[in-house]
Amino acid sequence: MPLDGLARAFRVSPHHSSAILLKVNLVAASLDPTSLIDRATFRKAVQDYIVFGNGYLEPVRSRLGGTIALRHAMARYTRRGLIDGDYWWVPGVQEATKLAPGVVHLAMPDVNQELYGVPEYLSALQAALLNEAATLFRRRYYLNGSHAGYILYATGEIDVNDTQAIKDAMRAAKGPGNFRNMFVHAPNGKDGSIKIIPIAEAGAKDEFLGIKNATQADVMAAHRVPPQLLGIVPAQGSAFGNPKDATAMFYELEIEPLQAAFLEVNDRVGQEVVRFRARALASGG
């Protein structure tokens, strides 16, 4: 999956971006800053790691060669070099700047290759894109004035001029303010000589809701985030359970593994760069 595509897909679905930002917020909030990394740098690296499956931290060296800080290198524009350990900043096709030696590259494991990481949610990306497509289609459906779509069936004493006038009126009814009435006078018309046959109005509505619900479930399953933590309202007659219990379980199953992944930075640098505060458990009530 191209990195540009992952960047564009970050906000295609509210459930997709919200789940990512929830993880970023919780991991970043648990950081105990050190002299080598600040909160802003760490947050950017965490977000890149979850969105792209890759996080890069470039060392800042002192005159004596020691590491005095780590700065964030955007995963969208960072590439590995041909020589192992070389990393390049490539914001454009004709632009490339070699990063300082010793770049820390955190990558989510992939079963097919080991050069770059792959985000965990990739299996649900098509569902997130379908969710966006359904929303955009529905929005255009209202903006272009074709709310229902119908066939106007006419027989009887309607001459060519009247037929053309009806066509012109129908064309003028499209677009903003399309809810208009139409008067048709057929002196010798019979019952049923003019019929309006709707096209899939109810079916389109049901299909839209079905797509939204199905894709939401796929995205949330890929991110493994409890629905009550994303502000989702339970269906009528159902409940999600205690949000404190859900938060505690989510923290243990998802946030702590992310913290463990970033502790690898310490092994790469050879000193304590990343450390986390002990989580204060919320008291029950």
Q: What are these regions, as identified by a protein language model?
A:
Residues 1-190:
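Structured, contiguous alpha/beta core segments that scaffold functional sites
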Residues 110-285:
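A contiguous, surface-oriented mixed alpha/beta subdomain in the mid-to-C-terminal portion of proteins
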